[in-house]
């Protein structure tokens, strides 16, 4: 997380790591957190040889063009987990001194979860073009 501290984070000039509110604008536009996850995930499954997600990859259409891929995460140590199952993205907003807000896409559902995790974890980030 320290690599993305602040809205500029690791993004190139003219871009920034989205805030929690900016992610909410996207999820609201796509129909709300309870149903927009499938619109943000790539389609296909590992088992069928057509994608990167494990079965069932519920509701995945990627109609938004977000192209969420299930990179999983790294824990506070050196363990990588949830690859093929989750796409986890940090926002630039802190929950507390040791925690940060993020968004999560899940292979078995169509929701987008608004969660907070230990800043020592390794989640993916997205860069959003400045207005």
Give names to the regions the model predicted.
Residues 1-131:
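Conserved positions within compact, well-structured domain cores
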